[in-house]
Curated annotation (Swiss-Prot):
HAMAP family to which the protein is assigned, alphabetical: DNA_mis_repair (MF_00149)
Biased composition regions of type Polar residues, renumbered to the chain: 375-396
UniProt source species: Syntrophotalea carbinolica (strain DSM 2380 / NBRC 103641 / GraBd1)
Keywords assigned by UniProt, alphabetized: DNA damage, DNA repair
UniProt family annotation: Belongs to the DNA mismatch repair MutL/HexB family.
Disordered: region residues: 332-416
Name of protein: DNA mismatch repair protein MutL
GO cellular component, as recorded: mismatch repair complex
Gene encoding the protein: mutL
Secretion signal, residue range per the UniProt entry: none
Annotated GO MF terms: ATP binding; ATP hydrolysis activity; ATP-dependent DNA damage sensor activity; mismatched DNA binding
GO biological process: mismatch repair
Length: 628
């Protein structure tokens, strides 16, 4: 009987390995630049032609290699970074498998030039399709130069999957942006077809590097983070205020021990950290570094090394969430970046340009080919304190997001109702401990929906419904976490009838409903008597409120813990209780609202992620009136 199983030839093994490691030109750039960083390079230049299809050249001034090491680096699983099994669990380098160079050389025309600093001359190796064609001494500067020509020349099926030059160039730019952000102390230069796209010099801080690559305007809306955690963990970097957000994940740069990762645990923690601060479908812009004991994280999970596995996932997740929430909560409202202001100094931009996927053009959804300065980060189309960002209407704020019918139904306008100034309008009494909102000079109420205030030279417009929504939500949340929400006894119990499905849900969740402030007793069949409801919601439509909360329980499902969707339920309750738009407020009511905002965490945004206030500087107003 003939033998069916046989050992594959080395060249075919390398091509198979290349399928895992080398997906596109950007994958080649990533592997080569990571090798340069591991070699201690302080200057790295990347030259590409035709989006990396024709040429990729990476030049570095790292430690270089001897003749023997130059030959060995082309062998599979040959590496200087791992010697024993235990080394896999304390990795401090970006590379470690010894697969990249032989895999790349197997599918390209590969040239390696390298020299040790102490040697008089270097060495050149020419490889084609994994076979060494020529080797000789060469005059090269200390460091390493690797050229990759005609990628996938011998695997045409793989080459057919490459996109347009602009698309591949965009992916290379994105890869280099990640690597450059991770190493501010390293100089990077990026060239395409002989033209320099961007260059970043050695910088002393992450702020300077982020300003070069993401844009000065973006960095002005970012906040520094520094937090020590359990088990020696440390989180540091920059996070955006809620004002700066994007529709995709392209603005989130997360690193573990200096390695860029896209980990589900970290992504979930970031989403939790910004929960109820961003509108649905929006994501923050951030550059975050998590330093952790290498023995507590496994990076040998995926060929791209973008996925990791933590030994204590819950510990890492909760540490990141708490660090983000604490930093976002501690930033005073008055310090939230307004146009031209920043929590720290941003250096002048030189000639760097971010090369990243353009997420704003549907026709180019898979074509990262936008090359212009400052496009590495973008402001949201959801407004925040700057008036220039307003693109949404009042109607979309009230009815759709709150889930309460009729929330935005406006009464007929009248001269009295359009803009009202209370007779006793006066500057708020300021003390040394006055918060931002309490220090505002209250001018009046516009269209019974917005409070008009003045802060020094700035004009402030406050959305009364969004502000009350945040206040009510935080009050309910605080009471719930304390054990139970305060209840109000009804003089006459309200009998509610449900269908069979919802009736079973009410019966099953009566304890949870009681903790939320609703005391319900079975009244026979699928009927229940409501005897108590949250004191804060005593003015709300009790029947509709209970039915809405029960519907939320039905949406959660029996298999999920109530706490998972707790904030959604509390938000629904807050929507019923709060002051609506088009509701006339007295001066004392408006002043009480301002005072309460200062006592409320995350008061710059409602729980849906919309801003509670907008700010115009005097300069902005003068420009609008053509006076500047």
């Amino acid at each position: 009987m003939s033998q069916k199983i046989h050992i594959l030839p080395e060249s075919l093994c390398n091509q198979i390995a290349a399928g895992e490691v080398v997906e596109r030109p950007a994958s080649v750039v990533k592997e080569l630049v990571e090798n340069a960083l591991d070699a201690g390079a302080s200057r790295i230049q990347v030259d590409v032609e035709n989006g990396g299809k024709r040429l990729i050249r990476v030049t570095d001034n790292g430690c270089g290699m001897s003749r023997e090491d130059a030959f060995l680096c082309l062998e599979r699983h040959a590496t200087s970074k791992v010697r024993a099994e235990q080394d896999l669990f304390r990795l401090t380098t970006l590379g470690f498998r010894g697969e990249a160079l032989p895999s790349i050389a197997a599918v390209s025309r590969f040239t390696l030039r390298t020299r040790l600093a102490e040697d008089v001359e270097g060495w050149e190796l020419v490889v084609e399709g994994g076979t060494v064609k020529r080797s000789s001494a060469a005059g090269v500067p200390p460091g390493t130069i690797i050229e990759i020509r005609n990628l996938f020349f011998n695997t045409p099926a793989r080459r057919k999957f490459l996109r347009r030059d602009e698309t591949e160039l965009g992916h290379i730019g994105e890869t280099l942006t990640r690597l450059a952000l991770s190493c501010p102390e390293v100089c990077f230069r990026f060239m395409h077809n002989g033209r320099m796209l961007w260059e970043v010099n050695r910088q002393k801080s992450l702020v300077e590097r982020a300003a070069e690559l993401l844009g000065r305007e973006a960095v002005r809306d970012m906040l520094p983070v520094e937090r020590q955690g359990p088990e020696g963990m440390r989180l540091h970097g920059l996070i955006s205020s809620p004002r700066l957000n994007r529709s995709g994940l392209g603005g989130m740069f997360t690193f573990i021990n200096g390695r860029f990762i896209r980990d589900k645990v970290v992504q979930h923690a970031l989403a939790d950290g910004y929960r109820n601060l961003l509108a649905k479908g929006r994501h923050p812009v951030l550059v975050l570094f998590l330093e952790i004991d290498p023995s507590q994280v496994d990076v040998n999970v995926h060929p791209t090394k973008h996925e990791v596995r933590f030994r204590q996932q819950a510990l890492v997740h909760d540490f990141i969430v708490k660090a983000l929430r604490d930093h976002l909560q501690q930033v005073p409202t008055s310090a939230m970046p307004a146009p031209g202001n920043s929590p720290f100094t941003v250096p002048a931009r030189e000639n760097a340009a971010s090369v990243k996927p353009d997420e704003t053009k549907p026709a180019l959804a898979d074509t990262p080919a936008a090359f212009s300065a400052g496009e590495g980060s973008s402001r949201s189309d959801v407004p925040y304190p700057s008036a220039s960002q307003v693109t949404e209407t009042t109607d979309s704020y009230d009815a759709h997001d709150s889930g309460v019918e009729g929330a935005s139904t406006a009464p007929p306008l009248s001269e009295e109702g359009l803009f009202s100034v209370t007779a006793d309008v006066r500057p708020s009494e300021q003390t040394e401990n006055s918060g931002f909102f309490a220090s505002l000079r209250l001018i009046g109420q516009y269209q019974n929906s917005y409070l008009v205030c003045q802060s020094e030279k700035d004009l402030i417009l406050i959305d009364q419904h969004a502000a009350h929504e945040r206040i009510g939500f935080e009050h309910l949340r605080k009471q719930y976490l304390a054990g139970s929400i305060e209840r109000q006894l009804l003089l006459f119990p309200l009998v509610l009838e449900f269908d069979f499905r919802l009736g079973r849900i009410v019966e099953e969740q009566r304890d949870s409903l009681f903790r939320l402030g609703f005391a319900l007793e079975n009244f026979g069949g699928n009927a229940f008597a409501l005897k108590e409801l949250p004191r804060m919601l005593k003015e709300a439509d009790a029947e509709r409120l209970v039915r809405d909360v029960v519907d939320e329980f039905a949406a959660i499902g029996r298999s999920q813990a109530v706490e998972i969707e707790l904030e959604r339920i509390l938000l629904k309750m807050a929507c019923h209780a709060m002051v609506r738009a088009h509701q006339r407020l007295s001066f004392d009511e408006m002043q009480a609202l301002l005072d309460e905002l200062d006592k409320t965490p995350f008061s710059s945004n409602c729980p849906h992620g919309r801003p509670t206030f907008l700010r115009w500087s005097l300069g902005e107003l003068e420009r609008l009136f053509k006076r500047a």
